[in-house]
Amino acid sequence: MAANVPPSAETLLSGAAAHPPKTAEEIANQYNLLPKLIPYLDRHLVFPLLEFSSGQDDEKEVVRAKYELLKHTNMTDYVANLWKEINNSDDIPDEFVKKREEVLAKLQQYEEESAKITQLLQDESVVANLRSDKVANLKFLEEQHGVTIEMVNSLYDYGRFQYSCGSYGNAAELLYQFRVLSTDNDKVASATWGKFASEILTTSWEAAMEEVQKVKDSIETRLFNNPLGQLQNRSWLIHWSLFPFFNHDPARDVLTDLFFSPAYINTIQTNCPWILRYLAAAVITNRNRAHKSSSVYQKQLKDLIRVVRQEGYEYNDPITDFVKALYVDFDFEEAQKKLGEAEDVLRSDFFLVSTTDAFVEAARHLISESYCKIHQRIDIKDLSTRLGLNQDEGEKWIVNLIRDTRVDAKIDYKEGTVIMNHPPQSVYQQVIEKTKGAFFRTQVLRFVRLLYPHD
């Protein structure tokens, strides 16, 4: 035993080589959030996520998942086609034929029951007499046109049925008409969620953002004395809001502010910390948006760093790890590594795939800005490596960075360096500069002394 020696560096390095880096597919699978997102989404909202995954997962499994997802809806023709694909059959069971007939009959029934009130609500002379007072509106329609509560409720039932059939545009209109007249707060809240989903599924982003505000207001007022109900409903709203968040540019600022607000950041930290991925992606890509003021962006970045630091034990992925490496640990090598992994995760995420290039671009800017702040002389080759670029690409990148950010710096092409003309350093920067080289040695010495105090 006494003759044993620690393993050599060569042994350790050869051992590391036996565990090669994960492939992009392995990274994407490891950080796939679909199982966490599904419980907070309506089944119709889950469908586009499954569609997106069909290019990444086993096609047969995706088809089966679609069937299980939609078999209880009234999208009878589509569900029947999925059944035929799963069972490799040209024929469908009688139950599908029967259900289709029932759905068509029900649609006809709802159309007849709601015909009078829908016609009235399309009559400009009638609509002109409606006011913000729902009770007065109902009284007017009842006295002047014979409208009943049952007719109003038929709009709700018809809208829900159209939604179940996949007729989202019709559903949105019917639920809107119901909401204008109904005084049933529970049904109005349900109709608002239904209209929100319908606007998402028809990609009507401006209308969807109007529903975000209505749902938010409903949560605050209807559930003001029900903290658990508020937590659950806020969690749903956060997840549903991901659709306009990354598909409608004007939504970005509104939803970033909403997610950072005390009630919603608390919801994220308590109930769904994986949403930090989307918040981090939004904040980092916000850097590229020309209208974004520096002070607002710095505030968002500061808030993001704080939350990522707090929640690191609860949730992390390459996107949040990138933030931690760069702004908490000041580890540029780790930040560059995590940026590479983050790119794989972003390209495999339904909500973030379109932001991938913008994220990588912004992240490289953040790495280079942070690196330049704490170094006086920068080796172009070294910085290029940290940005994941070759030397020529890195040189062009740095030239553009100096031009775009107007930093006081000059490039020494002969030496392959950038000379930063920093203003007098803050205490914060001086501490980083002085400790970055000594930190590792200090920690090792302290560790050795703790283990071997008498040596």
Curated annotation (Swiss-Prot):
SUPFAM superfamilies: Winged helix' DNA-binding domain. Gene3D superfamilies: 1.25.40.570. It comes from the Eukaryota. GO terms for molecular function: translation initiation factor activity. GO terms for biological process: formation of cytoplasmic translation initiation complex. InterPro entries: eIF3e, eIF3e_N, PCI_dom, WH_DNA-bd_sf. It is found in: Cytoplasm. Keywords: Cytoplasm, Initiation factor, Protein biosynthesis. It holds the Pfam family PCI. One of its GO terms (cellular component) is eukaryotic 48S preinitiation complex. CDD domains: eIF3E. Residues 256-425 form the PCI domain. Component of the eukaryotic translation initiation factor 3 (eIF-3) complex, which is involved in protein synthesis of a specialized repertoire of mRNAs and, together with other initiation factors, stimulates binding of mRNA and methionyl-tRNAi to the 40S ribosome. The eIF-3 complex specifically targets and initiates translation of a subset of mRNAs involved in cell proliferation. Component of the eukaryotic translation initiation factor 3 (eIF-3) complex. Belongs to the eIF-3 subunit E family. This is Eukaryotic translation initiation factor 3 subunit E. It comes from Neosartorya fischeri (strain ATCC 1020 / DSM 3700 / CBS 544.65 / FGSC A1164 / JCM 1740 / NRRL 181 / WB 181) (Aspergillus fischerianus). The gene is int6.
